[in-house]
Amino acid sequence: MFPFSYPADDRWLLPEGIEELLPEEAERLELLRRRVLDRFAAWGYRLVMPPLIEFIDSLLTGAGHDLDIQTFKLIDQASGRLLGIRADMTPQVARIDARTHAGDTPGRFCYLGSVLHTQADRLEKSRSPIQFGAELYGHSGRASDLEIIRLMLEVLTTAGVERIHLDLGHVGIFRGLARQAGLTGEQEGELFSLLQQKARPELTAAVASLDIDPPLARMFTELVDLNGRHGVMERARECLSEANAAVHMALEELAVLAERLGDCCPEVPVNFDLAELRGYRYQTGVVFAAFVPGYGREIARGGRYDDIGKVFGRARPATGFSADLKVVLRLSGLGESFVGSGEAIFAPAVSDPALIAAIRELRDAGRIVIEALPGQQGDAAAHGFRSELRRNGERWCVCPVASKDT
C-alpha cells in the first residue's frame, strides 16, 4: 500500500512531460505512422520491434554518457539485475544487426515506437517521444549516406512537411584537428562543448591555453564561422589548408555529398555547419539534420556511426536517421486531410440481417460505419454525420443526411 495518496482532484494528472493523445490526434498520428512505415517498406527497409525494456548493460553498451543520464532505471524483480527503459532505439537496432544479419550484405532496418527520457526536451517539454528512424548497415561509401538522407527527406515530404532545408557536417573535421594537435580526452571534451555553444570568445581563450601550434589554434577557432551555404567549402579548404589528410578527406566527402544531393534533391537547400558535432562521441563521419522555418531545432537528424556494433561483437559500417513522430505530425499537413467522424456513416439501431450485411460490406471496403445503440438520443444529423444508411425496399443504401436547418 502506498504511504500517501493524491487528492481526488489531482488523480487525473500525468507526470511532467508525459502526454496522452485523444482520439482525433491519435488517429492522425496513426495515419502518419502508416505512411512512414509504408515509405520505409517501399525502400526495402524491414521493420524491427526492439523491446521497451532491457538489461542496462545491453541497452547502454557503447551509447555514451548522454544516453545513460536520459535512461530510466529499475530493478528486475525476477533476476535482481538493473533494467533500463529505452531512451533511444538506435543501439537496439545495432544489436539486432550484429546478432541476426548473417553475411556482409547490407542490412536495412526501420523502427517506430515509444521511448522515455528522464529529462524533458527544452523545446518540446516532452519526455515521451515516439521515435522512428531507419538504419543502413554494411556499407561505408558515400552512396549509403546519400540513400539515408534521401530517404529521410522523402519520408518527411510524404508526411506533409514543407520547406525543408538540410544541414551537413562531418565529425571527422574536428576529430582530425584534435588528433593533429595531440589533445587529451579532457581537452578535446572542453573544445567540443564550446564549439556546440558556438562560444567564440571562450573557445579562443581555451585554445590559447593549450600548447599547440598557432596554425592549429587558428583552425579550431575558425570552425565556429564555417557555416552557411554558398562559398563555405571554398573558405573551409582555405582556412584548413594546413590540416592533416583526415580533415581534407572529410571536406571532400562533404563536397561530393552536397553535389549529389543537389542533383537528386534540387528543391532542398543545403547548408554546411562544420562546428555541428551532435552525436560526436559515437558518430564517425557525416552528420546531418533537417530543419523547417519557424521551428527552433531540427525535426530529424542522423549520421554515420561505423563503430556502434563493435561492442556487440560485429563492427559494421552504419548510417541512419531518427525523428519524433509527434513533432513531425505537428509540422505536417495531415490535420486538413484527416478522416474524422464527419466521413463516417451512421447506421440506425435496427435488427435486420440485411442491415448487418450492408454494414459488413461497407467496412470491408474501408468505410467507417458507426452503429446507433438502442435508446441512443439524437439522429444522424444531431450527431454531425453527413451520411447514413437508409432502407430502400429490400436494400440498405448510403444516403446523405439532411441538414437540421432544412
From Swiss-Prot:
Keywords: Amino-acid biosynthesis, Cytoplasm, Histidine biosynthesis. One of its GO terms (biological process) is L-histidine biosynthetic process. InterPro entries: aa-tRNA-synth_II/BPL/LPL (IPR045864), HisRS-like_core (IPR041715), HisRS/HisZ (IPR004516), HisZ (IPR004517). Pathway: Amino-acid biosynthesis; L-histidine biosynthesis; L-histidine from 5-phospho-alpha-D-ribose 1-diphosphate: step 1/9. The keyword Isomerase does not apply. The keyword Amino-acid biosynthesis applies. It is found in: Cytoplasm. GO terms for cellular component: cytoplasm. GO terms for molecular function: histidine-tRNA ligase activity. Required for the first step of histidine biosynthesis. May allow the feedback regulation of ATP phosphoribosyltransferase activity by histidine. HAMAP family: HisZ. Belongs to the class-II aminoacyl-tRNA synthetase family. HisZ subfamily. This function is generally fulfilled by the C-terminal part of HisG, which is missing in some bacteria such as this one. Heteromultimer composed of HisG and HisZ subunits. This is ATP phosphoribosyltransferase regulatory subunit. It comes from Methylococcus capsulatus (strain ATCC 33009 / NCIMB 11132 / Bath).
